[in-house]
Amino acid sequence: MASTTGEDGEVAATSRYPLCNADEREGQRLSLLQKLGDPITVRWFERLGVGPGWRCVELGAGGGSIAEWLSDCVGPTGRVTAVDRDTSLLEPLAASRANVEVVKGDLCELELPESRFDLVHSRSVLMHVPCSDRVLEQAVRCLAPGGRVFFEETDGAPGQELSDAPEPYRAVFGPILARWTWARSIADTLRRLGLADVEDDVRQDPLEGGTDKSEFWKFTLGSVAELQEKALSSEERAAELRSQGLDPGELLRELPAMLALLDDPGFSVPFTARHRVTGRRPA
């Protein structure tokens, strides 16, 4: 049976990331994220040559679908370490797979063993944590010679550059997209850290109503709205959000109209750019 490392293990558990995997809405959101993203992620793994015997670490493993695929791919001679601050959805995987270790902890306090892994992967996680560059440093440090990193993160520039956006879109998504800038720096950081063959594949990703992606965003906005409502009950927290360019009241006022647009098959706007960044540690 595989192991689960908890608060007393190599990573301390805290809650910097605001959405809880155990929450019913978040579970549905993660399922949609897996449906949308897993086929693309798997194609990239195949392109990188992931196979039997590889030692892999998944940072922010979420619902565990990618860790499960990696477990099947690397086989009994390989190893998969799945890291998340909330491991409730990962524990069944750890209990049933001899080649899977689940680590419960905070990525900002992550200490991975040096020169250990053949693959480090993360998807739609590092853009949300305050220590993203530190995690990149840890990822490079833990690569074995010849090992690969693969990061999938989102840039909000396309949606920010939309001049004629509907008001609900501007009010709800404008402040969110404005904060998503980190992804464009990943490739340069990896080069600075000494990786070779660094590639940044960037693809535009529109937002269209009546799709799985819009359904994903309905769940996401529901969780965000709950956080905003809590902020309104705390003047200190509300002031902090306003200092970041976020207006909880405006978001909540415009949210019903935005949710209606997400249900409308005729709604389509430029939204994000997806960065898929790979790099290799020289042998």
Q: Which ranges hold each PLM region?
A:
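Class I SAM-dependent methyltransferase SAM/SAH-binding core
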Residues: 57, 62-110, 134
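Conserved catalytic/acceptor-binding region of the Class I
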Residues: 150-234
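Class I SAM-dependent methyltransferase Rossmann-like catalytic core
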Residues: 14-38
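A short acidic, Gly/Pro-enriched loop at the edge of an enzyme's catalytic core
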Residues: 109-120
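C-terminal helical/coil "lid" or tail adjacent to the Rossmann-like core of SAM-dependent
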Residues: 19, 23-26, 201-270
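A short SAM/SAH-binding and catalytic strip from SAM-dependent methyltransferases
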Residues: 118-133
